């Protein structure tokens, strides 16, 4: 990730009649970041996304995309933005290629460049074999890929994805997540969801909304942990020396290892070290209790009342 800020939203406020739905929401996103926007149903996630995309007016605050103010330079700002709503905007009676060409033209891609733009988006989204098929004849997973393709056909710098894996089977979820990771290497992406595993699998940072307020905003790295247990105690120093481990904490059930990358890679490194040292591995398990506990603490009970 570099430090190029691609999306900056400050002080977003929104009312529905007399009810205030958003309270001074700030979001700043740099190239290479994937932000997981978490919240219960009705927390304000979709309202926030619609404001960021210019589909809904805010009653306060400002949004800049690639340095262009959405309020005063909407055309330039939206040219840098791709949006996948929770229900993809698909024309089911169109063929995939025809639909993507239409989307490219709507996004301002020149007529003589549309075919190349569609071919590029189709390739990235794994749609090369279905370009001539009707959208209605595709599986749910492929329709979701078409939805993502329409969001990237004009080469945006910022992607906003609302519940991108909703309704997919496990294999489709895996494929869509891998696609989002790949797209996130050169873009800034917001993934809105109420599904905690989505954040664990994708996000480099996560934000929790509750009743229209940001109640938490932090890197996801602190939540990537392994719980390990061995027959012979290795000691904290030996565990800290394992590649990818940034922090070691003792727990009643063994050790908690905070890692700076994918937990699977750290688990493999731990297993190799444990076998070499003869520690006797009893358990290697991703430990995500912290994220779930934090989410529940901030969105229910006394903590939620205090935050509101």
Regions found by a protein language model. Give the residues of each.
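A short linear hydrophobic-aromatic micro-motif
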Residues: 126, 244-249, 280-285
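Surface-exposed charge patches
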Residues: 102, 120, 237, 272, ...
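Non-catalytic surface loops within mature trypsin-like serine protease
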Residues: 31, 129, 230-232, 261-262, ...
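ABC transporter nucleotide-binding domains
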Residues: 4-9, 14-210, 214
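C-terminal coupling/interaction segments
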Residues: 262-308
